[in-house]
UniProtKB/Swiss-Prot annotation:
It comes from the Eukaryota. There is a cross-link at K903 (Glycyl lysine isopeptide (Lys-Gly) (interchain with G-Cter in ubiquitin)). Its EC number is 2.3.2.26. Residues 366-376 have a biased composition (Acidic residues). The gene is Ube3c. The active site is at C1051 (glycyl thioester intermediate). Residues 45-74 form the IQ domain. Autoubiquitinated; promoting its own degradation. One of its GO terms (biological process) is protein K29-linked ubiquitination. It catalyses: S-ubiquitinyl-[E2 ubiquitin-conjugating enzyme]-L-cysteine + [acceptor protein]-L-lysine = [E2 ubiquitin-conjugating enzyme]-L-cysteine + N(6)-ubiquitinyl-[acceptor protein]-L-lysine. This is Ubiquitin-protein ligase E3C. It is an enzyme of class 2 (transferase). Residues 1-40, 354-386 are annotated as: Disordered.
Amino acid sequence: MFSFEGDFKTRPKVSLGGASRKEEKASLLHRTQEERRKREEERRRLKNAVIIQSFIRGYRDRKQQYFIQRSAFDQCTDSAQPGGTFCLADGPNLTLLVRQLLFFYKQSEDSKRLIWLYQNLIKHSSLFVKQLDGSERLTCLFQIKRLMSLCCRLLQNCSDDSLNVALPMRMLEVFTSENTYLPVLQDSSYVVSVIEQILHYMVHSGYYRSLYLLINSKLPSSIEYSDLSRVPIAKILLENVLKPLHFTYSSCPEASRHQVFSAFTEEFLGAPFTDQIFHFVIPAFADAQTVFPYEPFLNALLLLESQSSKRCSGVPWLFYFVLTVGENYLGALSEDGLLVYLRVLQTFLSQLPASPTGTGCPDSTSDSEDDNEETDQPNSPEDGRVSAPYITEECLRKLDTKQQTNTLLNLVWRDSASEEVFTRMASICHTLMVQHRMMVPKVRLLYSLAFNARFLRHLWFLISSMTTQMITGSMVPLLQLISRGSPMSFEDSSRIIPLFYLFSSLFSHSLISIHDNEFFGDPIEVVGQRQSSMMPFTLEELILLSRCLRDACLGIIKLAYPETKPEVREEYVTAFQSIGVTTNSEMQQCIQMEQKRWVQLFKVITNLVKMLKSRDTRRNFCPPNHWLSEQEDIKADKVTQLYVPASRHVWRFRRMGRIGPLQSTLEVGLESLPLSVSEERQLAILTELPFVVPFEERVKIFQRLIYADKQEVQGDGPFLDGINVTIRRNYIYEDAYDKLSPENEPDLKKRIRVHLLNAHGLDEAGIDGGGIFREFLNELLKSGFNPNQGFFKTTNEGLLYPNPAAQMLVGDSFARHYYFLGRMLGKALYENMLVELPFAGFFLSKLLGTSADVDIHHLASLDPEVYRNLLFLKSYEEDVEELGLNFTVVNNDLGEAQVVELKFGGKDIPVTGANRIAYIHLVADYRLNKQIRPHCLAFRQGLANVVSLEWLRMFDQQEIQVLISGAQVPVSLEDLKSFTNYSGGYSADHPVIKIFWRVVEGFTDEEKRKLLKFVTSCSRPPLLGFKELYPAFCIHNGGSDLERLPTASTCMNLLKLPEFYDEALLRSKLLYAIECAAGFELS
């Protein structure tokens, strides 16, 4: 506690010890610095005090002067009443009043004074304007500007009901009209200059913001452009909006013009549209009678966008305005104006928010009824503004109009079209497909370009000719960089990705409609006239093009999995900063977008490559081994690590995830250990481009994967748990269908042991060590796929495909039969069994495809006659309606005719020249897909229950047929000899065996095949040679009875050969046996 002892002054501290000579250096320096700091703080405090005092004195004086001038103004207004001494009909007096008001004006206190002054200025406008012709012209011009600025500020409070906006609006009208100035000043050029200066000052003072608020406040929300003549204020407001634009367009310098358009854009068009703007103002601007400087506006808009450091939030509304108003001005644009228009479309379309519903893209996930209902409502319920999603949809719809499409197509198709035109057009199309998820058939611009051969050729030429400068100074094609897997700069990728994506997408779409005859350049004669081809490339050009596309895909895979950890290079940072990206989070977002663009590019190129490969598979146009890549050397013994036992997906399978030249992080599914870069690349190739690997290697990989899975399921021991079934030989299919159903045996990967009963119900001799099961499975598949069974039919070429009428035969359980047959075929593949089942190509394609649907080009393998008729209809040049077709097909199943509508109400829709393409594709889709969809889906599910479809997708339809039935190649006797076993006293040196091989060497290839079928039940050798045959081919001593015929046990691949020492006798007996297919019962 402190006490007061009478001292009220601080006394200096006196050190009685004297000055210490031992003061340390650090202490001295610290004390000196502290004293200096205190002196500096004192000086700053005094300076700040002077500033504050000066401000207070100025504020007090201004308040005093405001009061004095306001009082003087009020005295003048009082004196200006009738009978007063102050005359308003005098220019200097008006100038004095204006000067006073401008000095003290405060909107909260002086609004009424301003209104009174406006009233008198309008009344005596000529006297006031006359001051512009005297010595006070600059002062008068400044006063008019300030008055108009206050007028704009006043109108911004138009929502206040107490404010009468008539006088401020009349003020705007009077003092921006030439009629006010010309009678007084008489110099028209000076008048125009004065009005321009006034308008520019007003624009800087929020003129368009005031008009925006005024329109939304004073016009009813239900107003439309047709109401213009009935609502006088609407016409005045519209004129006021256009006035600065017209003056700006006529004679204003470019910089000032840009300022006016900038204000108009940001303050009037940049905000979400209200009903008044959307339904009245925009249609008014779009009216041809309303003259609007559209081309200068586009130039200013492009300049404004280039100078902006960040994206404008009002892009949807600006873009809608550009498209809507441009409908009446596109035809009048100059060539330079059209190029500017193209740039504006490219810029704003890329900034347009992604479409919320898409337009039928498979990737679209917003397809619920609620979402659709929301987008149908233009206004949001909160504030009556038109929503951004609705405007976005409207922009995309307007961009797809016939006029817009023709304008853009004319730009591209003209002979003088530059590389910039093609590049920007590609960017627009790329944005439509990628960002807005619009499909080629749904957009008029896209499908028009897709079927223009000249455009596609030129597009590929641009892609091939794009180059970049390397560090060494040499120019290298960008396509070559991609093929090498070399990273490229952000600018280079932005140049080539849109072009490459567009080319791949459009060419893929055009290939769907180009039938094989047209693709291969065969002449097409219809009604005596030769049809023009839509093929943009010759077969020779396609060979080179397909090789480039293949290498590009492989290069992108290398970019996805770089050998060294990638870094964000300096040029990427610079490129991102140039578009306003500064923070790390924004940069990472841009990097992810760049990665996504590479992924999307990879997908469309891969799709195009697969389509070309499919054509080559159906009818070869490429040289042998064309699709094999010399860059990739994938061996079966190097990919065993791709099998993951724990996951039971038995495949480290993933589609291409986030890939790009910037970062290598892929979303990985279930896996045990991380893969190396080489393994990642191999996996990507095997899943996306398997045909670049030789077929033999893929077969080895497939068999190794099967073996690895079998080791997990069955194990090595012969007595592990398996499946034991008893089957009656005369009822193989019925018993197997019952006892091997999913309910009884959910896992067919287990080892199956079969016990057969003969026709009399007695046990057949023998214990199943694998051979009886193979014989059982072979007979089961023959029975199940026999057309007489009713589940499969044959084409004209004898190829199997699901019977559409199967449901009529077995009822609703037909899908279970197809599931069962799929499982059995999968079991044959799983056990490496060859079965001679010739399937139709389109059916195998449906099994391998991810969508289970195939296109019209496969129709020829199902019904060549229908295919030819549809091609005839496509090229028919007479009146199509005369053919009397409608959107129906007729099924004749089991003698019963049934009419099926291809679309709702199809029987009442005639086929015309306009809709025949749709009819053709609907017919093909019905025959190939809809009619047998449940059959194929059930069969696929059964097949996938035993063998992963991802493994099978390493092969095309022809290769799968070879995998099922073996290749039609000559039987190699040397290979067969090398892997033949002998029993019962025979050996390789036995005389009978030597005679046997001499006899077989003299057989024709057909006779050798019959021998092979006689012993193994399959006429084709194993894919990888007889070393893969299990059990091995074996010749057993059949005894010395020369009257007996050679017999075979196909379940054991065993030939029982009697001891024929006479070559002629052995030949005749053996040929008789194989021709008659002698078994146990024929001796």
